[in-house]
Amino acid sequence: MSQEKYIMAIDQGTTSSRAIIFNKKGEKVSSSQKEFTQIFPQAGWVEHNANEIWNSVQSVIAGAFIESGVKPNQIEAIGITNQRETTVVWDKNTGLPIYNAIVWQSRQTAPLAEQLKSQGYVEKFHEKTGLIIDAYFSATKVRWILDHVEGAQERAEKGELLFGTIDTWLVWKLTDGAAHVTDYSNAARTMLYNIKELKWDDEILEILNIPKAMLPEVRSNSEIYGKTAPFHFYGGEVPISGMAGDQQAALFGQLAFEPGMVKNTYGTGSFIIMNTGEEMQLSENNLLTTIGYGINGKVYYALEGSIFIAGSAIQWLRDGLRMVENSPESEKYALNSHNNDEVYVVPAFTGLGAPYWDQNARGSVFGLTRGTSKEDFIKATLQSIAYQVRDIIDTMQVDAKTAIQVLKVDGGAAMNNFLMQFQADILGIDIARAKNLETTALGAAFLAGLSVGYWKDLDELRTLNETGELFEPSMNESRKEQLYKGWKKAVKATQVFAEIDD
């Protein structure tokens, strides 16, 4: 065993950190996971302690070594993937954050975002960054920290403070301050990065009064950014050579290397990303334009659609309504439903995401009769996830002017066979479920391994994460369109009800 080499992926998520060791076949050798504290200072605010995140990462690195018996000198390279947009500002000399990390979900900077919109910057920001102006992205979070921590603006202008998303923070810590870098995919989510010119945008920085000296250097997704300081990696000096935001890492882990390839991660929400190739395409229908990844001197762009409620709708059945004991049980109930699919659940618990962007909408149910059973209700909830995915896939095809032939899927709810079959039916295309559902961590490992020659090229990677199961559509066209028309009616009625509430 002592001669075998491995790749370690660090997957720093919203609620936990994980370290996974992969072998040459792309198989998981061991993993370790640690949750950390969610901080809610006020309603709608979400923060993390950046030092606690760093401690959790150190803990899972140790855990992965202990579980596997792999030694630090057997790790050929490290790949990092992370919760995107979450913002850290720290003191360059002490290495201490000057405020908590402001998390992507946090709405504390919404007034700043509204101010930018009212000043007429929507189109300018969209053309430069591919994003809509929103508190979701890092730009307003940096501005908020500089405004609310005494003396921060002045210190930033003197070059005493550094900004980074979580990838940047972890590389800076692992290298003991030797590398202050980010990658294309994370930079593209800051709302400060010009994704066409591939540079920090001076005009946006001026509008927000953010000193350029704070910003990390932007690098490709697969290159050596630095080496671990031996005292942070149990004596090992290992290259950190792959980085990507979590959804882009999943795109890469799903081997979606060709333009037109699309992946959907069924997590708490659902994130659908299409590789659009080397040409940047601005969405005309409220999807986000972003960078998928950049390797070998080329940058590949992507369109992204976000669904707020996917797997969490099944959690609601379990925890809120107590209709199921556990999430996998929903499949059994759905298969035992014998109604004619006339019940529609619109799970707009926190509004509707793409392509509607209706924050006032709330959850609703249509088509109930005296004969409606628990099984019917559970089935309708699962179907709502598939209908929302169709909303985005239809929009993507219009934006990209291309027909999507197959949808690559991963994430927890992708294990639900009923949902996957209904997804294939309502889209009318094949659903390819990855054999290895650890696609986010695998994507980071692939990027790291390519850079150091652990894997030779994309062709070698294509042999590693084959499709586990293919779901083919079996519903006839008229039935499919009749069901989808009912969904569109249900969404419209939900939005009308929200208007009446005003």
Curated annotation (Swiss-Prot):
GO terms for cellular component: cytosol. Activated by phosphorylation and inhibited by fructose 1,6-bisphosphate (FBP). InterPro entries: ATPase_NBD (IPR043129), Carb_kinase_FGGY (IPR000577), Carb_kinase_FGGY_CS (IPR018483), FGGY_C (IPR018485), FGGY_N (IPR018484), Glycerol_kin (IPR005999). Gene3D superfamilies: 3.30.420.40. The phosphoenolpyruvate-dependent sugar phosphotransferase system (PTS), including enzyme I, and histidine-containing protein (HPr) are required for the phosphorylation, which leads to the activation of the enzyme. Pathway: Polyol metabolism; glycerol degradation via glycerol kinase pathway; sn-glycerol 3-phosphate from glycerol: step 1/1. Sn-glycerol 3-phosphate binds at T14, R84, E85, Y136, D246. The modification Phosphohistidine is found at H232. The keyword ATP-binding applies. Its EC number is 2.7.1.30. Glycerol binds at R84, E85, Y136, D246, Q247. It catalyses: glycerol + ATP = sn-glycerol 3-phosphate + ADP + H(+). Keywords: ATP-binding, Glycerol metabolism, Kinase, Nucleotide-binding, Phosphoprotein, Transferase. ADP binds at T14, R18, T268, G311, G412, N416. ATP binds at T14, T15, S16, T268, G311, Q315, G412. Homotetramer and homodimer (in equilibrium). Belongs to the FGGY kinase family. Key enzyme in the regulation of glycerol uptake and metabolism. Catalyzes the phosphorylation of glycerol to yield sn-glycerol 3-phosphate. This is Glycerol kinase. It comes from Streptococcus gordonii (strain Challis / ATCC 35105 / BCRC 15272 / CH1 / DL1 / V288). The gene is glpK.
